Swiss-Prot record:
<feature type="glycosylation site" description="N-linked (GlcNAc...) asparagine">
    <location>
        <position position="173"/>
    </location>
</feature>
<keyword id="KW-0732">Signal</keyword>
<keyword id="KW-1015">Disulfide bond</keyword>
<dbReference type="InterPro" id="IPR009079">
    <property type="entry name" value="4_helix_cytokine-like_core"/>
</dbReference>
<dbReference type="GO" id="GO:1903489">
    <property type="term" value="P:positive regulation of lactation"/>
</dbReference>
<protein>
    <recommendedName>
        <fullName>Prolactin-2B1</fullName>
    </recommendedName>
</protein>
<dbReference type="GO" id="GO:0005148">
    <property type="term" value="F:prolactin receptor binding"/>
</dbReference>
<dbReference type="GO" id="GO:0031667">
    <property type="term" value="P:response to nutrient levels"/>
</dbReference>
<keyword id="KW-0325">Glycoprotein</keyword>
<feature type="disulfide bond">
    <location>
        <begin position="89"/>
        <end position="194"/>
    </location>
</feature>
<dbReference type="GO" id="GO:0005615">
    <property type="term" value="C:extracellular space"/>
</dbReference>
<feature type="signal peptide">
    <location>
        <begin position="1"/>
        <end position="31"/>
    </location>
</feature>
<feature type="disulfide bond">
    <location>
        <begin position="203"/>
        <end position="228"/>
    </location>
</feature>
<dbReference type="GO" id="GO:0005179">
    <property type="term" value="F:hormone activity"/>
</dbReference>
<dbReference type="InterPro" id="IPR001400">
    <property type="entry name" value="Somatotropin/Prolactin"/>
</dbReference>
<keyword id="KW-0372">Hormone</keyword>
<comment type="similarity">
    <text>Belongs to the somatotropin/prolactin family.</text>
</comment>
Amino acid sequence: MLLYLPQIFSSRASSLLFLVPYLLFWENVASISTCAERDATIQHSLEKLLTLTTFMSHVMSIETAKLFTEFNNQYAQGKRYNDRIPGTCHTAFFDTPVNKEQSLGSDPKTLLKLVRSLLNSWTNALNHLVNEISAMQGDPSFLFSKAREIQAKFDELTTGVKTILSMIGERDNDTHLAWSGLSSLQSSNEDVRCFSFYTLIRCLLRDSRKVNTYLEVIKYQIFNQNNC
């Protein structure tokens, strides 16, 4: 029996973990590759899952902004990190649309695969962010808690995107870009360590906003253009 998605979506406390039976159902359904081949029920279910996934990405970007703001307040005051030449984000080498208008001109399947690759690329980095931020001087308890919350949302969002790919007849992919900044997060030089955290969280915020934008565009394309 399928879960009633509108009821799940109505609660901000809900997460994609409540959709596990629904997601497992889709893993055992033969994927249908085009919108024209789908019946109305399947298309409606796809739209509901897209709505929930897009909402989750919006929440994730908000929580990441809170993490960035709090880190600035606790560890970056007076250090003028924003004036330094920023480190390159490890996901910068993906060929991504530069703005929402360019995203609207992208194929939704290609855009969805890009979202999956961005999420994949943060698995290792987020794990180390959570582990290392707890060792920061002072009281990093809020930062640690928020980082764990964001990591959980990334995992849930990845599950949702993986399921949507299956629903539209696309194979899941493990494409990702490796992160190699652990030594900087563990540096004995406090300034190097703090700036590395600042850069990593800034990149996380950048990518969480990209993921939200791309999912909003994909939802618009499928809802309004019946385009898959």
